[in-house]
From Swiss-Prot:
It is found in: Cell membrane. It is a lipid-anchor. One of its GO terms (cellular component) is plasma membrane. Belongs to the staphylococcal tandem lipoprotein family. This is Uncharacterized lipoprotein SERP2465. Its main location: membrane. Residues 1-22 form the signal peptide. A lipid is attached at C23 (S-diacylglycerol cysteine). Keywords: Cell membrane, Lipoprotein, Membrane, Palmitate, Signal. A lipid is attached at C23 (N-palmitoyl cysteine). NCBIfam families: SA_tandem_lipo (TIGR01742). Pfam families: DUF576. It comes from Staphylococcus epidermidis (strain ATCC 35984 / DSM 28319 / BCRC 17069 / CCUG 31568 / BM 3577 / RP62A).
Length: 259
């Protein structure tokens, strides 16, 4: 009888220890998820930025990588990638550097089609069209004969101009990853097609699937801030060997480069 009581007490102790440990891990995950959200929210809370020229007056995170007199540069990148089943992967997007020192913004509209040669090796067919921003409008720097490309540039909007992450704090049950050695971190969430940002993407792009996407927030560098780190936002609708549909976006603040 005494042995039974001791055994029962031992089992109870182990169960309590396991439960407390489990709660500890949950709290650690919850804490890291909160840290990741706060880190991303420093930039995402600025969305939507309808007039990108407002960024000339907005400063991001500064550290020792910046020269004393450097006001910094915002680097924006938005890109849509679509590969219908069995077809080539096509991407269309834009990169823009908004230099706060010179009050000028230049970049490229970039198209690419990934094809495969007879040995199955991927071949990039990337084309860049230099652009600049004037009066909050993106315009080509050089004359472009292709009317379709001209129209795409004139109608292009960065994700930062129409996205809204006011509900970021409400995203729950994320798949959290953190590696302090790199350092790198990420949080992934299952979204619904009713999500505001998903609806915005569907309005602007011909997305050939009704499948709701996963949202991935991934970054490198110190969670508290780093000018040499990056933060990327990805919406993945379909991911496979022969079919891929995803949208990627980033807005990072970095030291300015000499022209």
């Amino acid at each position: 009888m005494k042995h039974s009581k001791k055994l029962l007490l031992c089992i109870s102790f182990l169960l309590i220890t396991f439960f407390i440990s489990g709660c500890g891990f949950m709290n650690k995950d919850d804490s890291k998820e909160t840290e990741i959200k706060k880190s991303f929210n420093k930039t995402l809370s600025m969305y939507p930025i309808k007039n990108l020229e407002d960024l000339y007056d907005k400063e991001g995170y500064r550290d020792e990588e910046f020269d004393k007199d450097d006001k910094g540069t915002w680097l924006l990148h938005s890109e849509m990638a679509i590969q219908r089943k069995g077809e080539d992967l096509e991407t269309r997007g834009m990169v823009l550097k908004i230099n706060r020192n010179t009050q000028t913004s230049k970049g490229d509209y970039i198209t690419n089609k990934i094809t495969y040669d007879n040995k199955g090796r991927p071949q990039s067919n990337k084309k860049k069209y230099p652009v600049k921003m004037e009066n909050n409008k993106i315009i080509p720097i050089k004359k472009i004969e292709d009317s379709k490309i001209n129209r795409e540039i004139n109608e292009f909007k960065f994700f930062a101009q129409y996205a809204n992450f006011k509900e970021l704090k409400d995203y729950k049950n994320g798949n959290i990853s953190y590696n302090p050695n790199v350092p790198s971190y990420s949080a992934e969430y299952d979204l619904e097609n009713t999500d505001y940002n998903v609806k915005q993407l569907r309005e602007r792009y011909d997305i050939p699937t009704k499948q709701a996407p996963k949202l991935l927030l991934k970054g490198t560098g110190d969670l508290k801030g780093s000018s040499i780190g990056t933060k990327d936002v990805e919406f993945t609708f379909v991911k496979g060997k022969q079919e891929n549909i995803y949208f990627s976006d980033s807005m990072n603040f970095m030291p300015s480069e000499d022209d």
